[in-house]
Curated annotation (Swiss-Prot):
Keywords assigned by UniProt, alphabetized: Apoptosis, Carboxypeptidase, Glycoprotein, Golgi apparatus, Hydrolase, Membrane, Protease, Signal, Transmembrane, Transmembrane helix
Hydrolase listed as a keyword: yes
Main location class: Golgi
Cytoplasmic side: 530-597
Protein's membrane topology: Single-pass type I membrane protein
Gene this chain is encoded by: KEX1
GO BP terms in the entry: proteolysis
Name of this protein: Pheromone-processing carboxypeptidase KEX1
Signal peptide: 1-18
Protein source organism: Phytophthora infestans (strain T30-4) (Potato late blight agent)
Catalysis performed (reactions): Preferential release of a C-terminal arginine or lysine residue
Lumenal side: 19-508
A GO CC term assigned to this protein in UniProt: membrane
Pfam families noted in UniProt: Peptidase_S10
């Protein structure tokens, strides 16, 4: 999501009402890119770009860039790519891993050897209006996601009408689209469920003349369920950034965030403090670099500069000859920004709203969904994604939760491409060697993800030997575990399942013997008291003079036994007491400074 926490402080250059609009084109041929600055003229890429007016006026226009598939374009599916933010241009996805193009500098286009257009038609969209090259007159930004979903649906139907090769005649005069897929990252974890839900509802409306065949969606490092994803301490602890005590401290303070979300406050300082506390704690002294929460393998002077290639995108798209070539905004006062501060501010109140219910509904309706996470991204990390998926309840839940986990490889790589769990119509991947932006970090792996998904191929290269036990979300809260005993002899060592079973048996046996010992101790004590009483009475009867006898009552003896039991089996023996230590906090929240890519 590059900017989910970092909406660059200097996002300036808002559009004015004086902007000159490029004449609206109604045919695909009008949007054909003839000569793209910086591209080798010998490059064989068929591409279109332009803007489509919403609501049949020039007030709001949405920009797109389309690439025809290199192979069998008349049958290949249409794959839509959406960046996040909210308010970040999809030109980031275009130039940083997905399209046929990369930028060598701010003027020269290179070739992406792992372009998705090799097997799919690609469509990159700048949305909501006011994002990237998309236009809104008078900075009339959308204030709710329902309106944004309506805008996107209108854009998509008009795009299909303009590029009518994607439509075929169906029954009762309804036009059916070719297979359509939506992929995106970061805040697209909100866009894609919202847009998919709207498309499905419109498909069921008999008044609509176009039915969009949404065949599947993919969400990379997505921001889906903030109630879980605002909490970063478990992921940070796994990296060695925090101690158990610091995790306990952060989880205690996280209750304020949950209270804010429950109260309907979806953009709360208390929710941003969790990440700030971690990054502030691990940062070295004054002048030191900061942890890049989009890729924890890096420490950067300015996290807002991530990814490093983004500055070339802004410079390239701001060249007038480029704007003319892509049929964009030709007003000399217009400035193309990677992320729109205005769009972000208008929608910031939705930052803590969950789309998990829509994900669940879409799965229940049979929509194929794939979630994938770069393992080194902390902002939208794999721990949070795996946990939120355990909160889903649909007709494929059992199949997904009980599914084996697989290691999958990509041709040309000896190391794993990632790890997969797939059941029902849901697939979840953890991608090795990648941070927040998987297509940028491992473009060959990202291309393989899309290729397998659109061709309905599984990620089942090698099943993992560790047995899968069905879990639910509450199981993820367990803080302590037992270490199984493993024989040093490989011939007599236990399997993972056997080790777990043996360890569990040892625990149960130990508890049983503990109870036996307690019962024996109580019985022995009672017998001893009785014997003592009998002896004293016999002795008293045998003496001529009266003697004073001090006795310990049964109640006192039992209380003493219980006190001894408590001393023998303290809380430290039953559970682990973790001292809570404070985590230093910094006031500046990454999320308040940037959104995402």
């Amino acid at each position: 999501m590059v900017t989910r926490h970092v909406l660059a402080a200097a996002l300036a250059g808002s559009m004015t009402s004086a902007q000159r609009l490029h004449p609206t084109s109604q045919r695909a041929s009008d949007d054909l890119i003839q000569n793209l600055p910086g591209l080798d003229p010998a490059a064989k890429v068929t591409q279109h770009a332009g803007r489509i007016a919403l609501h049949d006026n020039d007030k709001n226009k949405m920009f797109y860039w389309h690439f025809q598939a290199a192979q069998d374009p008349e049958k290949a599916p249409l794959v839509i790519w959406l960046n996040g933010g909210p308010g970040c241009t999809s030109m980031q996805g275009l130039f940083l891993g997905n399209s046929p193009f990369t930028l060598k500098d701010d003027s020269t286009i290179g070739k992406n050897e792992h372009s998705w257009h090799e097997f799919a038609n690609l469509l990159f969209v700048d949305q909501p209006i006011g994002t990237g090259m998309s236009y809104t007159k008078g900075n009339d930004y959308r204030l709710d996601e329902e309106t944004i979903a309506q805008d996107f649906y209108e854009f998509l139907t008009k795009f299909l009408q303009r590029h009518n090769k994607y439509l075929s005649d169906g029954d009762d005069g309804v036009s059916n689209s070719r297979a359509v897929y939506m992929f995106g990252e970061s805040h697209a974890g909100r866009w894609i469920p919202e847009f998919s839900d709207h498309i499905m509802k419109q498909n069921n409306d008999p008044k609509n003349q176009i039915k969009i065949n949404l065949d599947g969606v993919g969400i990379g490092n997505g921001w889906v369920h903030p109630r879980i994803q605002y909490e970063y301490s478990d992921y940070a602890h796994g990296l060695g950034l925090l101690t158990f005590g610091q995790v306990r401290s952060l989880k205690a303070s996280y209750a304020e965030c949950l209270a804010a979300l429950d109260a309907g406050t979806y953009y709360s300082r208390s929710c941003l403090d969790n990440m700030d506390s971690i990054t502030g704690s691990v940062k070295p002294g004054n002048g030191g670099n900061s942890l890049n929460f989009y890729d924890v393998r890096q420490y950067l002077r300015n996290v807002g500069s991530y990814p490093s290639g983004q500055s070339n995108i802004a410079k390239y798209m701001n060249k007038m000859e480029v704007r003319k070539a892509v049929h964009g905004n030709e007003d000399k006062n217009f400035r193309f920004d990677l992320c729109s501060n205005g769009v972000f501010r208008a929608l910031s109140k939705f930052d803590g709203v969950s789309t998990l219910d829509k994900v669940e509904s879409l799965l229940q309706q049979g929509l194929r969904m794939i979630f994938y996470n770069g393992q080194w991204d902390m902002m939208c990390n794999h721990y949070g994604t795996e946990k939120l998926l355990l909160n889903l309840n649909w007709n494929g839940s059992d199949a997904y939760q009980q599914a084996d986990k697989y290691t999958w490889r990509v041709q040309g790589r000896k190391e794993p491409a990632g790890f997969a769990q797939q059941g029902g119509n849901l697939t979840y991947l953890v991608v090795t060697g990648a941070g927040h932006m998987v297509p940028m970090d491992v473009p060959d792996v990202a291309a393989d993800i899309l290729r397998r998904f659109v061709n309905r191929l599984e990620f089942n290269d090698k099943v993992q030997t560790v047995v899968t036990t069905r879990l639910n979300a509450t199981d993820m809260e367990v803080s302590f575990c037992y270490s199984p005993s493993v024989s040093a002899d490989p011939d007599t060592s236990l399997s993972t399942r056997d080790q777990t079973g043996a360890n569990s048996s040892q625990v149960h046996i130990g508890i049983a013997w503990l109870w036996v010992a307690l019962v024996i101790a109580v019985v022995s004590s009672v017998l001893a008291v009785c014997v003592t009483i009998v002896c004293i009475r016999n002795k008293r009867n045998g003496k001529q003079e009266h003697e004073m006898i001090t006795q310990v009552s049964d109640d006192e003896e039992v209380n003493q036994i219980e006190d001894e039991s408590e001393e023998g089996f303290s809380d430290e023996d039953v559970g682990v007491h973790v001292l809570v230590s404070n985590v230093s906090q910094r006031a500046t929240s990454p999320r308040s400074r940037v959104t995402e890519v």
